[in-house]
Amino acid sequence: MKKVLPLVAVMAGLFAASVQAAPEINLGVLGGENSTAQIGNNQCVKTFLESETGTTVNIRNASDYSAVIQGLLGDQVDLVLNMSPKSYASVYLKDQSKVELVGITTDDTDNSKGYHSVVLVKADSPYQKLEDLKGKVFSFADPDSTSGFLIPNNQFEQKLGGNMDNQFNGFFKKVGFSGGHEQDILGVLNGQFDAAVTWTSMVGDREEGYSAGALRKVKENGFDDLMSNLRIIWQSPLIPNGPTIVRGDMDPDLKAKLVAAVRKLDKEDHSCFVKAAGGKLHLEETSISEYQTVIDLVKAQQKTVR
């Protein structure tokens, strides 16, 4: 004899299954020193994407680059609007299915697709060039940052010799990580470090913190006289701008909607995209070739660590 379930039980089961299966989009945001401001800057993205995709969007605030990397690898992050090239490379080398390029963030000012790692000192300090920092305290930003560690570390190894573990053959008195770009900037301002690295486009109005980068972000967060209190004494070769990425193995239909919505956001609510991306940036087409140099450098670094 067949067992007949009450209709209400069947309906309840179907409802529970549908609720459980409801898709959501997780927007990865690197909070850093001003996580509240970063979350606020992405509220317009959340609203726009929810309207376009009909899907709930969660803002996932990450304390550091590693959290974004692990979020993608662990299916907890689906979208990053302006990802560190090194972090992108780290995910790509670990599992290519977890990261898919949508575009490269490109400067509105001159359409450049690159930025620089720079070394900052206080404007009233005697330091005018990298060589003047011998015996001083220096800070990188984050070990998973391109401009905050990968590129300047590689350049210092070539220029100064040694590595971070031996303070580049004893050139610096002390070398460490602050935890992020904003922390580096504030650490220089308050005298915690003699010098530190951050990232900037190096184009546009200097007094505004240039067109994009951490300097501009800090200035916009209330440090009106920031640029008059800092001096740049070194800059790296051009680094490819951060990519906009989605998680590669998310539901294909939802991914297609999400990619279309992000491109529409850039075109139809560009001020929102600018606020969330961290500067006067827009999206252009890209491919793996633009990031191959960074990928190769990360791969070489990983082999050295092993």
Segment roles from a protein language model:
Residues A22-V29, E33-C44, A214-K217, V246-R306:
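An extracytoplasmic/periplasmic, membrane-proximal ligand-sensing/linker region
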Residues N26-S51, P85, T109-L186, S271, ...:
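Bilobed "Venus flytrap"/periplasmic-binding protein-like clamshell domains
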Residues P143-D251:
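Pocket-lining segment of extracytoplasmic ligand-binding domains
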Residues G40, C44, F48, A67, ...:
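Extracytoplasmic/secreted proteins, especially bacterial periplasmic and envelope-associated proteins
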Residues A22-A89:
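Extracytoplasmic small-molecule ligand-binding "clamshell" domains
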Residues L73-L81, Q96-K98, V137-F138, L189-M202:
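Alpha-to-beta junction loops
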Residues M1-Q20:
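Gram-negative bacterial Sec-dependent N-terminal signal peptides
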Residues K98-S112, N229-Q235:
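A structural signal for short loop-to-beta-strand junctions that line the ligand-binding cleft
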